[in-house]
UniProtKB/Swiss-Prot annotation:
Residues 367-392 are annotated as: RCL. Belongs to the serpin family. GO terms for molecular function: serine-type endopeptidase inhibitor activity. This is Serine protease inhibitor A3M. It comes from Mus musculus. It is found in: Secreted. SUPFAM superfamilies: Serpins. It comes from the Eukaryota.
Amino acid sequence: MAFIAALGILMAGICPTVLCFSDDTWGIDILLHKNQESGTPDDSLTLASINTDFAFSLYKKMALKNPDKNIVFSPLSISAALALVSLGAKGNTLEEILEGLKFNLTETSEADIHQGFGHLLQRLSQPEDQDQINIGNAMFIEKDLQILAEFHEKTRALYQTEAFTADFQQPTEATKLINDYVSNQTQGMIKKLISELDDRTLMVLVNYIYFKGKWKISFDPQDTFESEFYLDEKRSVKVPMMKMKFLTTRHFRDEELSCSVLELKYTGNASALFILPDQGRMQQVEASLQPETLRKWWKSLKTRKIGELYLPKFSISTDYNLKDILPELGIKEIFSKQADLSGITGTKDLSVSQVVHKAVLDVAETGTEAAAATGFIFGFRSRRLQTMTVQFNRPFLMVISHTGVQTTLFMAKVTNPK
C-alpha cells in the first residue's frame, strides 16, 4: 500500500539584486537549540489537533467543489509547505497564512509554530525498518536571485530544505529539473508535478511525502475477486475486491453519525481508519468532520472479531491547484500584488503564482509474511468476541495517521475505486 503526495509553490516577480543579511525578529540560534530538544507530548498533541483542523477544513472545501469525485491529499504536505513560506512572510501576509493553517496567534508564537513543525518533520524522517516514509522540502531558485541568508538557514534547519539553482529563462529545462527531483523522491510515483512554468517564475518550493505501508495482516491475493462497488443507489461498477476472514481488529459503530469506523494497522507506527457512512449519509459525516470527531473515533474503537472484511483494491490519483481553494480558508494575500514576502529576498517584489498539489493512493493486498501470524494477537485470547461482516462496497473515507507523532498524514475519499 503506497500513498504519495507532492506540492509545488511557484513564486513570480521582478528579479531583484539583494545582498544577504540577517533578520533578528526571533533568534535563529535560540530556535535551532530548542528544535534539537525533544518536543513535549502536549506540544505534539496541540500541533496534531491544529493540523487535523486544517485537514478537515481543506477537505470540506475540496468535497464541496467536487462532491462526487475521489479526493486524495496530504494535509501535512500542504501545511508544512505553507508554514515554510510563512518564514519569509511579514505583516498581514504572515497572519493570513498562519491563521489559515488554524493557528491562534494570541496563544501560539510564530517561533513555537516553526519549532513544532521542525520537530514533527524530524521525527518522521527518522529511519525505521518497518515504516517507509520519505518527507522533505526543496527550493529551486532563479540563478540570478539572491535570497536572505536568514531565510535560507531557517528553511534548512527547521524544514530540512534542500536548495538548488535553476534557470527559469529556460522553462523546459527548469521544469524537467524539478519534475525529475520529485519523481526520484517519490519512487517514480509522481512524474510530472509541474506542467508549465510562468515566464516570471523566480522560485519554486516543493514539498513531497512518500509513504509505503505494509499491512500488519496482509490480504491473500488468491482471495481477491471481482465484485460490485455501489457508486450510489442506482449505479455500480465492477472492482477487484480484497477479502479477509477472521480478522481481530478495532471497530466502532457511530450511531450518532450513521457510520462505521474500522482500523487497519501497518507494521511500524502508521495506522489507517476506514470510515464507512451508511447509504446516503456521506454528506452528514463530511459535515461533522472536526478534530473532536476524530478523537472520539480513536477513543471509541473496541477490539472486535471481524468474520469477513471486504475492501476494494484500487489506485487513484488527484491533482489540485490550491490557488482556487486556499483563499476560501483566508489565505489570499500571497497571491496578490499586496503580498509581503520580503523575508525571502528583502523586497516586496515576490508573490505566489501557483500552488500545485498531486497525490497518489495505492491500496493492495501486500503485507509482510510474518504479520498474519502476529497481527491476530491483541491480548484478548481468553474472551469470545461476536463476529461481524464489514463490506466497503460503497463510498468511504480513509485517514492515515502516524501514531508516533499523532498526526494525520493523508486523507482520502473513495467514491469510485475503478
